[in-house]
A protein has these predicted regions:
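Intrinsically disordered, low-complexity N-terminal regions enriched in serine/proline/glycine
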Residues: 14, 46, 128, 151-152
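Conserved active-site-adjacent core of cysteine acyl-enzyme catalytic domains
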Residues: 9, 56-116, 120-150
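Charged phosphate-binding loop/patch that engages nucleotide di/tri-phosphates or the phosphate backbone
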Residues: 147-162
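A generic structural signal for solvent-exposed, polar alpha-helical segments
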Residues: 18-21, 124, 158-159
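Active-site nucleophile-adjacent alpha helix/oxyanion-hole segment immediately C-terminal to the catalytic cysteine
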Residues: 2-64, 79-80
Length: 162
């Protein structure tokens, strides 16, 4: 049986938009670790800590299923007690997004399989931005929303970690 990680084991404070805690970007340390980094940003962990926990759950950045399936990211969020919407919602506009969501960008087909890059959308005080874990970016807190082309999103509905 999986044991959920307790809040006392965290290094940083978790995100809670009601308390005005600002989320910090987490840079992925592996070329394909955007899903792990996105969860780390939501939960408030460093990449190495989130990576270690993900690995203990059988989730590895090198696994191609992590790049093209949603279940691994949902499993990691569940482990931390984070609740999400039950389905992927097609992206319509930045204004229509909830205050906190996982977004799929750079969505593409490769050999008949879908792939994307995970990022986190945050709206604080009426202003939206994206936490993008890509290592080569000048800033991992992005406000150039028009340059991104989201395909769909998953709403994060409860960040009250247990």
């Amino acid at each position: 049986m999986l044991r959920r990680t307790r809040i006392s084991e965290f290094i940083w404070k978790p995100y809670n938009h009601k308390l005005g805690i600002i989320m910090k970007p987490v840079v992925q340390l592996e070329r394909t670790g955007c899903g792990i980094a996105s969860v780390a940003a939501i939960v408030g962990l460093s990449y190495p800590k989130a990576q270690s926990i993900a690995n203990s759950l059988g989730i590895f950045a090198q696994d191609e299923h992590l790049w093209s399936e949603i279940s691994h990211v949902r499993k990691l969020l569940w482990h931390f007690g984070i609740k999400t919407g039950s389905r992927e919602i097609p992206f319509r506009s930045w204004e229509a997004l909830p205050d906190l969501a996982l977004l799929s960008i750079k969505w593409h087909l490769e050999k008949g399989r879908t792939y994307w890059h995970w990022v986190v959308f945050v709206r604080e005080n009426g202003h939206g931005y994206v936490l993008d874990s890509k290592k080569s970016l000048r800033s991992n807190r992005r406000t150039d929303l028009g340059r991104m082309k989201p395909k769909w999103y998953i709403q994060v509905t409860d960040t009250q970690l247990r």
